[in-house]
Amino acid sequence: MHCPFCFAVDTKVIDSRLVGEGSSVRRRRQCLVCNERFTTFEVAELVMPRVIKSNDVREPFNEDKLRSGMLRALEKRPVSADDVEMALNHIKSQLRATGEREVPSKMIGNLVMEQLKKLDKVAYIRFASVYRSFEDIKDFGEEIARLQD
């Protein structure tokens, strides 16, 4: 690591500690040339897979798009923001765990429905009605019947 004071290349780590519930490392470093001390933080870079849309267009994963879709389904429902964040983190973890560089949007939609089903059945039906393009009341009834099984 370059020294921010004299830009020398040689620095040594004096102390390392986990911070942020173990999600990052704080390091105290000392320059071997000018002896100045400074702090660095290291965080793992978690790369999300690209999304393959139904029309075969590929685009970067967009967490805001995922969040807004879930929040739209959960609008005016008694679900806490913490529960929504936990569900989003679970979906992202599952996507990373595939190890794939690209995932179909259908997989993401199914993961969202899985999480919504656990959070709130009404939100699940709202999302499923759009995601699966329900065309009449019969489609709603069939999905509700599946929920009750």
From Swiss-Prot:
Its cofactor is Zn(2+). Binds 1 zinc ion. InterPro entries: ATP-cone_dom, NrdR-like_N, RNR_NrdR-like. The keyword Ribosomal protein does not apply. Keywords: ATP-binding, DNA-binding, Metal-binding, Nucleotide-binding, Repressor, Transcription, Transcription regulation, Zinc, Zinc-finger. A zinc finger (unnamed) spans 3-34. GO terms for biological process: negative regulation of DNA-templated transcription. The keyword DNA-binding applies. One of its GO terms (molecular function) is zinc ion binding. Residues 49-139 form the ATP-cone domain. HAMAP family: NrdR. Belongs to the NrdR family. Negatively regulates transcription of bacterial ribonucleotide reductase nrd genes and operons by binding to NrdR-boxes. This is Putative transcriptional repressor NrdR. It comes from Salmonella typhi.
